């Protein structure tokens, strides 16, 4: 991500980046803001990207159609409107509440009876591109028993109508927490292994992720773990001078890091700081001599003499050659931490990966089930190379407040997964004694044994002396 005409892409909306748009219904949508493009939000309207460039993230915009020429999104009936900035999302399209009742006793719970405005009239206003505020105000005027509702009931009614007819939206920065929230709301819980925002943040903290660290990772969440690690290491800045690196070990032919397409990092930046390697190449890398015997790089003159088809084949082989040498280098490296989110059998995998971790460095494993981590912790208890394996579970219960009431949110998502955390240690070897020390120790032990034998002999003589007078008395 680079600055565009003085715009800071970390705090301000800039072109050619992915953002999170929060709709009036509180649903989320990921949109790529291409310069001079038009973004359609379906029934909520459409707008031009250039009109929101430069505003700060978190700004709420309203789509208005007053004095706008009719122009529709190509292939749809969605009309393109102008953008106006709202001070507060909560105040958007909120007609003033004047009259209310102390209770709902006189209400008639039949919408067709109390609502004089028909659906045909509402659809006609929508086709005329009327604002959400105008539609909601008209519905309130046509509602016979609206003023017989309590204030709380009126607020709930307005909230429902705003979610349906309002045309405002909020642009938010697409960070790892927002991306995870979007995936969960979308229903991709299995894709991210049921991880919660709290578990994700706890894993990054326990793994001690920092900008200049070298980390080993197994990510089966589609790239969410790597996305969060990059955010923690470089804070979304493609111009960062930090030299941190992430090595991603994968079991398939190609790694699944699909979610990195939503990041604002350039391809060169990701290639420089994220290295992928298969499990086989990591544990059993090829020998450097064998690689060099299979391929020999050519000089610049020899490359120029090649034909076009042979030249392309040569560059493919050259890429393979450098990749194999890089795999050998990675397999021989040591790392500052290990972060695993995988369905592989951890009790045999973690000890193998742990050999590549520096001493006094953390190891963090995530699983949506407790049993695999429990079995892993039991196996690590018996291994002196790992210190204090601990199981953690995070729970965050949001509360909602109503007038005079406070209770937990009844529709919250369960689960969130479990974490196993320990430290890689290097046990000190037993000290070797000097030869003279060993000889003195042996002499001392032999002297002590001799003293013990002499003491036992004296005790036996005393026993014999006590027995002899007794025997003489018996004879007499």
UniProtKB/Swiss-Prot annotation:
An example Gene Ontology biological process: tRNA methylation
Record carries keyword tRNA processing: yes
Signal peptide positions (record): none
Assigned keywords, A-Z: Nucleus, RNA-binding, tRNA processing
InterPro entries according to UniProt: TRM6 (IPR017423)
Annotated GO MF terms: RNA binding
One cellular-component annotation, GO: tRNA (m1A) methyltransferase complex
Cell compartment(s), UniProt: Nucleus
Pfam families reported for this sequence: Gcd10p
Span list, region Disordered: 433-476
Function of the molecule: Substrate-binding subunit of tRNA (adenine-N(1)-)-methyltransferase, which catalyzes the formation of N(1)-methyladenine at position 58 (m1A58) in initiator methionyl-tRNA.
Family: Belongs to the TRM6/GCD10 family.
Subunit-structure text: Heterotetramer; composed of two copies of TRM6 and two copies of TRM61.
Record-given protein name: tRNA (adenine(58)-N(1))-methyltransferase non-catalytic subunit TRM6
Encoding gene per record: TRM6
């Amino acid at each position: 991500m680079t600055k565009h005409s003085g715009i800071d892409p970390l705090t301000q909306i800039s072109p050619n980046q992915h953002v999170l748009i929060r709709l009036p219904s509180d649903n989320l949508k990921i949109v790529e803001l291409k310069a001079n493009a038009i973004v359609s939000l379906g029934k909520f309207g459409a707008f031009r990207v250039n009109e929101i460039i430069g505003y700060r993230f978190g700004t709420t915009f309203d789509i208005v159609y007053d004095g706008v020429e009719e122009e529709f999104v190509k292939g749809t009936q969605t009309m393109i409107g102008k953008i106006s900035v709202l001070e507060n999302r909560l105040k958007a399209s909120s007609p003033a509440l004047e009259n209310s009742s102390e209770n709902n006793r006189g209400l008639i719970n039949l919408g067709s009876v109390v609502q004089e405005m028909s659906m045909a009239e509402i659809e006609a206003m929508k086709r005329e591109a009327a604002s959400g505020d105008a539609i909601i105000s008209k519905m309130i005027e046509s509602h016979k028993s609206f003023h017989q509702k309590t204030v709380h009931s009126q607020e709930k009614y307005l909230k429902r109508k705003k979610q349906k007819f309002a045309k405002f939206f909020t642009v938010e920065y697409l960070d790892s927490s927002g991306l995870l929230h979007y995936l969960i709301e979308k229903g991709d819980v299995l894709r991210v292994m049921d991880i919660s925002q709290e578990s994700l943040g706890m894993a990054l903290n326990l793994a001690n992720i920092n900008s200049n660290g070298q980390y080993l990772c197994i990510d089966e969440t589609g790239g969410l773990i790597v996305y969060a690690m990059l955010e923690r290491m470089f804070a979304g800045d493609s111009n960062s001078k930090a030299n941190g690196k992430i090595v991603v070990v994968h079991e398939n032919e190609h790694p699944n890091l699909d979610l990195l397409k939503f990041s604002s990092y350039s391809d060169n930046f990701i290639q420089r700081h994220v290295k992928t390697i298969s499990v086989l190449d990591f544990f059993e890398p090829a020998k450097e001599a064998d690689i060099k015997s299979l391929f020999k790089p050519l000089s610049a003159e020899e490359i120029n003499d090649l034909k076009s088809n042979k030249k392309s084949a040569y560059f493919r082989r050259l890429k393979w050659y450098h990749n194999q040498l890089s795999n050998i280098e990675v397999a021989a490296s040591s790392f500052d931490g290990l972060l695993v989110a995988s369905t592989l059998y951890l009790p045999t995998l973690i000890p193998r990966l742990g050999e590549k971790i520096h001493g006094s460095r953390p190891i963090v494993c995530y699983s949506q089930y407790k049993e695999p981590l429990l079995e892993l912790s039991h196996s690590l208890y018996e291994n002196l190379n790992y210190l204090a394996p601990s199981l953690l579970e995070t729970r965050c219960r949001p509360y909602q407040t109503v007038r005079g009431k406070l209770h937990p949110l009844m529709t919250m998502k369960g689960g969130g997964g479990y974490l196993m955390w320990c430290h890689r240690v290097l046990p000190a070897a037993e000290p070797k004694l000097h030869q003279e020390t060993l000889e003195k120790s042996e002499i001392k032990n032999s002297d002590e044994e001799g003293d013990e034998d002499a003491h036992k002999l004296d005790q036996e003589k005393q026993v014999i002396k006590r027995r002899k007078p007794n025997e003489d008395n018996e004879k007499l």
